[in-house]
Amino acid sequence: MRVVILGAGMAGLLAAKALAENNVEYTLFDKNPREGASNNPGLHYLHDSCGLPLEPKIVFNYIIGCKDGELPHEQYSRKLGTPLNNSLVNLPAYNIVYNFQDAYDILLHRYGKKVQHLKIVPSMMGSLLERYDKVISTIPLPVLFPEAKCEHIEVQAVKGRPFPTPILPGDNQVVYNIDENVNWYRYSRVFGVEWTEVKQGGDFTIKKVVDTNFHSPNDRVILLGRWGSWNRKFLAHHSYYETLRRLSKW
């Protein structure tokens, strides 16, 4: 079995972990080896340890700025211009999470030596399918399939908290502000790192995918991760378990 993984961010490295644990040889390509997605601005955490030696933490979720008679996800959608099926639909009071950066560092230490430099373009698909039995892609979907309809919205982020708005004390919390008259919409303090995400005027740009209906046209090409599948609900840890599931059928 010859397998290639495109992208060495969190999703790609978790796919590599699943393959390595099952003694499947693989090649791992990335256009920027040893950078991955760990340096991206904004809120990041893992929902599952995927067998890594990580300590679970509880992150509490809060919503402020609600209008009477309106559901939070509706107000949030209008404020950001996102679809109604957004993060505030059935938002739990808390999540049990794991440190994203620690996980990435462990994975990079284990599998980083396998990463080879290669910038993928759509014309490479034919040669990849000739050389490999399976292609696992975690890179942005339109890079591999430009015909896919891949929309996104852009917001901004700044480090720190939204002064002078009062924030609950303590670590490991996420506060959503859905008041449409306030620029910031999410504040997070998770694992000691603070971010405030705003509609405009930030120091960093964050892209948020708008789900597509595109599916892989070839059963040998497996699309993993939020960006690889262009599905906001495809979280990083899903890449690990989806790879294991696929392996059971190969």
Language model region names:
Residues 34, 184-250:
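Conserved flavin/dinucleotide-binding core of flavoenzymes
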Residues 1-11:
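Beta1/beta-strand and adjacent pyrophosphate-binding region of the FAD-binding site
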Residues 4, 59-62, 222:
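Conserved beta-strand elements of the Class I
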Residues 84-134, 138-142:
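Helical element adjacent to the flavin cofactor pocket in flavoenzyme catalytic cores
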Residues 3, 15-24:
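A short, Lys/Arg-enriched amphipathic alpha-helix followed by its capping loop at the start of a domain
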